[in-house]
Every structure is written in structure tokens, then in C-alpha cells.
Design a protein with these regions (language model features):
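Short catalytic/ligand-binding loop motif for oxyanion handling, primarily in non-cytosolic enzymes
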Residues: 52, 109-112
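Short, glycine-rich nucleotide/cofactor-binding loops
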Residues: 73-81, 176-183
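Short hydrophobic beta-strand that contains or immediately precedes a catalytic carboxylate
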Residues: 43-45
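Active-site-adjacent betaalpha module
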Residues: 1-41, 55-62, 91-96, 107-108, ...
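A solvent-exposed, charged loop/short amphipathic helix patch at secondary-structure junctions
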Residues: 55-75
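Short acidic, Gly/Ser-rich segments with clustered Asp/Glu that frequently serve as metal-coordination loops
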Residues: 47-55
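A short, N-terminal amphipathic alpha-helix
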Residues: 80-99
Length: 246
């Protein structure tokens, strides 16, 4: 089972360890203690057509900027790691009653004026408005009945969206994260979720960025205290254990 650097590195005095990662009874080495799928959401960050399609505008923009190797790394990461692990994680989450959330970078404004300035040209060039094919979830994750969907105007899944309200209304206090890219939109989603008080997990092998070094750095930063670092297999096992206990 994967362990977070913060827990494994002995950062915490013993009297503080019970409050790490916003988990009331956190214990190092027991990542899934008191885990409840019914109070959990799986937030899929930017797993949408314009972001990860090999022929899509985001990959094209990375290549046009002179970084074909970074585009190739992300595509290979998706094909070899993210995609296969999502095939394990998503069905297990839906069976266990985990609420699947699609957090999608797209516009609801005719001139894309709702998008943060730094990202606006990319979203506009992609034609990523809410309802467009570009802004729809990729086929690998689907959009099943019962899934939630939020449209974000910037990097994080919480900023400018109703996500916090929707989760709290359902009594959800725990979040699993998957998506792209780990150093940007995923990282900022996790950071915001931590400050909102959610217990959090980064499903590391369901995330990807533009280089192996970037992925390593993101996992180290996130794992320090924002979220526990786990694998898809870890999460599936925890969900199945809870389902069988019912």
C-alpha cells in the first residue's frame, strides 16, 4: 500500500498524528481507517476531451510551444497508467456508492469572459464551452447517471464552482482525486479541498503531468499534508472491504 511522505517521514509529534489529513482518527500506516464510501466523492479533474485527447488542442498547444516530449509523456502516462487504473477505480467507486464528480475547465460565457485571464486563450482556442464536445468527459470515464458535474473557470475544482455546496449537501467529507495535470489543476484542487476541511486521498496512478520529475514533485508536495498518496488498487480494496462488510 502506498504511504504519504508526511506520514512515513515522521513529521508529526505523536499527539498531533490523530488530526493529520483532516482525518479525526488518522494513524500512520492505516490510511483507510474509518473510510466510508457513502461519504466519499471521486473528483475527476479535467478528464475531458480537449485536455487529454491525443489530437486535442491542449496537447497541440504543448507541442506548438516546443515541448513535444512533454506532450508525449502525458499521453504515454495516460495510455499506460492512468487509463488502465481508471478502468479499475471507476466501476469500483460506482458500485460502492462513491459519488463521481466531473470537474471540467470550460466556459459558460459567450466571449469566455468567465475564464481566468491566464487560461482564457487556451479555453477559447479549444472551443471549450459548457455543452461542447470539447468540454465533455472522455469516453474512458463516461458520464453515468448519478455523476455530478461542475464547470470550473480556473485551475481548482472548488474555485468559482458549487462543488463544496454539493458535497456538503450529501454529507460527503472525504475526497479521492484523479485527473490532470498533477502539478496544476489537481494540486490546486487538493489544496483548496484541504482548507475546506475534507479528508483527502490522491490516487497517484490515476493522475499525470508532463514529466516524471513533475509527477514525483507533485506527489511529494501533496503527500506532505494535503492528501494521503494511494494507488487505485489501494482504493479499490478499501471500497470492496467496506461493501462486503455491509
Amino acid at each position: 500500500m502506498a504511504t504519504s511522505p508526511g506520514a512515513a517521514g515522521g513529521m508529526l509529534p505523536p499527539d498531533l498524528s490523530a488530526h493529520w489529513y483532516n482525518a479525526d482518527d488518522f494513524a500512520p500506516g492505516e490510511s483507510w481507517r474509518a473510510f466510508d464510501p457513502a461519504r466519499t466523492a471521486l473528483v475527476l479533474v479535467d478528464l475531458i476531451n480537449w485536455q487529454v485527447d491525443p489530437a486535442g488542442p491542449s496537447i497541440a498547444a504543448i507541442r506548438a510551444a516546443g515541448h513535444p516530449e512533454r506532450a508525449d509523456h502525458l499521453l504515454a502516462r495516460f495510455a499506460d497508467t492512468i487509463g488502465p487504473n481508471l478502468e479499475l477505480l471507476l466501476p469500483a467507486a460506482r458500485r460502492a456508492g462513491v459519488r463521481v464528480v466531473h470537474a471540467r475547465l470550460a466556459s459558460r460565457h459567450p466571449d469566455y469572459g468567465d475564464i481566468v485571464p491566464a487560461l482564457r486563450p487556451y479555453v477559447q482556442a479549444a472551443g471549450a464551452y459548457d455543452g461542447s464536445l470539447a468540454a465533455m468527459p472522455i469516453a474512458e470515464v463516461g458520464d453515468e447517471p448519478g455523476d455530478l458535474s461542475v464547470v470550473k473557470s480556473g485551475s481548482g475544482a472548488f474555485g468559482g464552482t458549487e462543488l463544496d455546496f454539493l458535497l456538503r449537501r450529501e454529507g460527503i467529507d472525504t475526497i479521492l482525486y484523479a485527473g490532470v495535470v498533477t502539478t496544476a489543476c489537481v494540486l490546486l484542487s487538493v489544496a483548496a479541498g484541504f482548507d475546506l476541511g475534507y479528508r483527502q486521498y490522491l490516487v497517484a496512478d490515476c493522475t499525470g503531468t508532463l514529466s516524471a520529475r513533475d509527477q514525483e514533485d507533485a506527489e511529494r508536495l501533496i503527500g506532505n499534508y494535503l492528501a494521503e498518496i494511494v494507488t487505485a488498487a489501494d482504493a479499490v480494496a478499501a471500497m470492496e472491504q467496506q461493501t462486503h462488510a455491509l
